[in-house]
A protein has these predicted regions:
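Short, solvent-exposed loop/turn elements at domain surfaces
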Residues: 41, 50-57, 288-289, 317, ...
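Extracellular glycoside hydrolase catalytic/binding regions
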Residues: 143, 150, 160-276, 282, ...
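Secretory targeting and sorting signals
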Residues: 1-28
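Aromatic- and carboxylate-lined catalytic core of secreted/periplasmic carbohydrate-active enzymes
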Residues: 267-339
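Residue-level detector of anion-binding/catalytic polar loops
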Residues: 79, 114-116, 186, 241, ...
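Active-site mouth of glycoside hydrolases
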Residues: 30-212
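Extracellular and organelle-lumenal recognition/adhesion modules and their flexible linkers in secreted
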Residues: 327-483
Length: 483
C-alpha cells in the first residue's frame, strides 16, 4: 500500500493556504445522468474522525483533522466521501449558519483532496410526523448544492424503518419536495443491514408512486455468501440500480486478517454482480469517548473497531485490500495466508472445535517459507474433528468446479487427517461436504491432500477445513490452495 506523503507541518500549512484562497471557480452544472454515473462507479469511504464520531464531528469540528483524514482516504483510492448530517445538531427546523458553514467547509476540503461528496440527511431522526418542517429543513440545506457537481447524491434518511407507516408517509412527501429544489440530484434511502433485501423490497413497493433513483445496500452479512446476498438485494429493487453503501466487519472480536478477507470477498462478489461502488464502513477506528454517550452506538464495543485505520492512523491489513480494489480493480488471494507466513493478527484462519484441539502456527517444520500449522494431541467433538477453516475470496456459484489442496506431514500421527470442502446455502444451512485422501498414520513425509468437487445446487458458500482429529501424535499443514 502506498504511504501518505504529507507530514503534520506541511499539512497544516497547506490547509491554512487553502483556507485563504478565493472560492473555487463555478462548476458546470451536473445532470441527473452524470451524477448517476458517478454514483454507480464511486470509490466511497464512510467517514467520521477517529476522535469525533457521529454528531461530535460537527460539535467538535476540527478542519485540520478532516483535511488529514480525507487526504489519507484519497491516497487509499477513494474518490468520494460520505458526509452525514444531523438535524438536531445542525439546527431544526432552521439550519444554523454556523453548521451549514461547517458543511460547506467539509465539501471544500473534500474537493481539495479530489473527493466528491455523498450527503446523508436525517440521521438519528424519528420525527416523521413533522413533514412540513422536514421538507423546509432539507430544502434549505440542499439548495446551495443543487447544481454543485461536487455533491453527487443525497440519502434522505439513513436506515429508514420500512415497516413504519408514518416514516413511509414522510418519505413519500419528502422525495418530490426535494426534487423541486434539486431536480438533478439522485435520491436514495437505506434500510438497516438486518432488514436487508426483504426490507429493500418492502421499501421499493411502498414508494412505487415516488420512486428513488437508486438503492443503497448496507451489507454486514457473512462475506463468503456475499454474492448471493448482493444478487438477492439487486433482485429486490430491480431494475433500479444498486450500490453497496456500507459494508465491513469489526476487529473487536475477530482478527484484522478476517476483516481484510471479509472486504476482499465483498469487493470480488460485487464485481461479479456488476455493482461498481462498494463503500467500506469506516475509514477509522474510534477512540474511547469519540462516540456520543447518549447514543446506543456508544454502548456497542464492535462499533469502535470497524476502521481500515487504527486510532493512531496506522493501517490495518484491510486498508491494503481496499487500496488494491480501488486502484487496481483486483483483490489478491494472498489475504488468505495460505502458507501461514502472516502474523497472527493478519491471518483470517479460524479455529473450528478448538476444545478438541487447536492448531498453532510454528516454525518447527515448514514445507516452504518459515512457518506451518501444527495439530497435536487432538480428540473430537461428537462426529466433528477439530480443524482450521477459511473460505475463498472467489464467490461460490452452484455448478462451479472447485479444487483444494494442502500438504500435510505426520509425526507418530493417529486418527484422521484430511481436508474437506463444506457447502452452505444463502441462509448458512449446511448442504454437504467433499473430503480428500487421508494422511497415512505414523511418520510421513510431506503428502498432498486434495479434493475436487462441483458446487452443489443451492450452494452459496464453501468452507475449507484442514482437519486432524483423534490424533495422539502431531500433524503439520502447509502450502494450501483453493480455486
Amino acid at each position: 500500500m502506498r504511504t501518505l506523503p504529507l507530514r503534520a507541518g506541511v499539512l497544516v500549512g497547506a490547509m491554512l493556504i487553502t483556507m485563504l484562497l478565493p472560492s473555487s471557480p463555478a462548476h458546470a452544472a451536473p445532470t441527473l445522468a452524470s451524477r448517476m454515473a458517478a454514483v454507480q462507479n464511486a470509490n466511497v469511504i464512510n467517514y467520521y474522525p477517529s476522535n469525533a464520531g457521529w454528531t461530535f464531528m460537527w460539535t467538535n469540528f476540527d478542519v485540520i483533522r478532516v483535511h488529514a483524514d480525507l487526504n489519507q482516504a484519497a491516497w487509499l483510492g477513494a474518490d468520494t466521501v460520505r458526509v452525514i448530517v444531523f438535524p438536531q445538531t445542525f439546527g431544526y427546523p432552521v439550519p444554523s449558519a454556523a453548521y451549514t458553514q461547517k458543511l460547506d467547509t467539509v465539501i471544500d476540503v473534500a474537493e481539495s483532496n479530489g473527493l466528491n461528496v455523498k450527503l446523508t440527511l436525517f440521521d438519528w431522526w424519528s420525527g416523521y410526523s413533522d413533514v412540513a418542517n422536514s421538507i423546509a429543513w432539507a430544502q434549505t440545506l440542499l439548495a446551495p448544492y443543487a447544481n454543485d457537481p461536487r455533491v453527487i447524491a443525497v440519502e434522505l434518511k439513513n436506515e429508514i424503518p420500512p415497516n413504519d407507516a408514518t416514516a413511509i408517509n414522510w418519505a413519500r412527501q419528502l422525495i418530490p419536495a426535494v426534487r423541486t429544489t434539486a431536480p438533478t440530484m439522485p435520491l436514495t434511502l437505506t434500510v438497516d443491514g438486518t432488514s436487508g433485501a426483504t426490507g429493500m423490497a418492502t421499501l421499493k413497493a411502498q414508494l412505487a408512486g415516488t420512486p428513488l433513483d437508486y438503492y443503497d445496500f448496507h451489507f454486514y452479512g457473512a462475506s463468503e455468501r456475499s454474492l448471493a446476498e448482493i444478487r438477492r438485494a439487486q433482485d429486490a429493487v430491480a431494475p433500479t440500480p444498486m450500490v453497496i453503501g456500507e459494508t465491513g466487519v469489526s476487529t473487536v472480536s475477530g482478527t484484522e486478517g478476517e476483516q481484510g478477507a471479509y472486504l476482499a470477498r465483498v469487493f470480488r462478489a460485487a464485481a461479479e454482480a456488476g455493482v461498481g461502488s462498494v463503500a467500506p464502513w469506516t475509514l477509522n477506528d474510534f477512540a474511547q469517548g469519540a462516540i456520543p454517550p447518549n447514543s446506543t452506538v456508544s454502548t456497542q464495543p464492535a462499533q469502535y473497531k470497524f476502521g481500515l485505520y487504527r486510532t493512531d492512523a496506522s493501517p490495518k491489513i484491510a486498508a491494503s485490500v481496499v487500496d488494491d480494489a480501488w486502484t487496481t480493480g483486483t483483490t489478491s488471494n494472498s489475504i488468505l495466508n495460505l502458507g501461514f507466513e502472516a502474523a497472527a493478527a493478519d491471518s483470517p484462519w479460524r479455529q473450528y472445535q478448538p476444545q478438541a484441539g487447536a492448531a498453532v502456527i510454528t516454525t518447527e517444520s515448514p514445507r516452504t517459507g518459515s512457518q506451518s500449522a501444527r495439530f497435536s494431541g487432538t480428540t473430537r467433538a461428537g462426529s466433528n474433528l477439530p480443524s482450521l477453516v477459511t473460505s475463498p475470496i472467489t464467490p461460490v456459484q452452484a455448478g462451479q468446479q472447485w479444487h483444494a489442496e494442502a500438504y500435510a506431514r505426520g509425526v507418530a500421527a493417529t486418527g484422521i487427517t484430511e481436508i474437506s470442502m463444506s457447502w452452505f446455502t444463502i441462509s448458512g444451512t449446511w448442504i454437504s461436504q467433499h473430503t480428500s485422501n487421508r494422511l497415512p498414520t505414523g511418520n510421513s513425509s510431506w503428502t498432498k491432500l486434495s479434493v475436487d468437487a462441483v458446487a452443489p445446487a443451492g450452494a452459496a458458500s464453501v468452507q475449507l477445513h484442514l482437519k486432524s482429529g483423534d490424533n495422539t501424535g502431531t500433524v503439520y499443514y502447509d502450502d494450501v490452495a483453493i480455486s
